[in-house]
Amino acid sequence: PANLVFEHGSSPLATVKNYASVFQDKIFLLYTLGTVFNGVIWLQIDNYIPVHLKESFIASSVFGIHISGAKMLSIMVFINTLIIVCFITTANRLTKEMKIIPQFLLGSIIFDLGMLFTIVFRSFWALFLLAILYTMGELICMPPSQVLRAEMMNENKLGTYSGFLNMAQPLASILAGAMISISATTGAVG
């Protein structure tokens, strides 16, 4: 828009000043920290859950098909993808009357509990149902998280805010990977 004035400077000092302004925005910092921790939980699908399924999953036969830990991981990812693709519009319609913060919190809690119990349970049907549960949480919390992100960013410093928030994913990856090493001493819930 013509009335939008970007306040970004082009010098290295201006870049430091831009990021310093983000550090003064305590609410956005808290949101970014939450994004890091949520990313750590989500990345367990790539990091800890395969290890858990390999070591702890109780192999079973479902409808005559042998299900190993590796197959269970594929089934869980398939369930997640299928539900997201088929029900995102329905979930948005069912939650459109909810206020943004309660919707975000509800979805996050459902997702986090689903993931927590995924690393505790070892049987096919429990993990099958938990994959549905954490996917429902994801469906509920993702739309408001995008709205919150957009509403919290200073319009004149979108690049700085976006760049700062983009650091959340690599930080989450580092922490999620470290949790595999930590889990060797803490056990299944580490």
What are these language model-derived features?
Residues A2-T32:
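Juxtamembrane intracellular "pre-TM" segments in multi-pass secondary transporters
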Residues N47-M72:
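Short amphipathic helix-loop junctions that connect adjacent transmembrane helices
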Residues A70, M153-L165:
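Loop-to-transmembrane helix entry/capping segments in MFS-fold secondary transporters
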Residues C86-I100:
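Helix-to-loop junctions at the C-terminal end of transmembrane segments
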Residues P102-F117:
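Structural signature of the two symmetry-related core transmembrane helices
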Residues I140-N154:
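Intracellular juxtamembrane helix-capping segments at the cytosolic ends
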Residues I182-G190:
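A membrane-interface helix-boundary motif in multi-pass transporters
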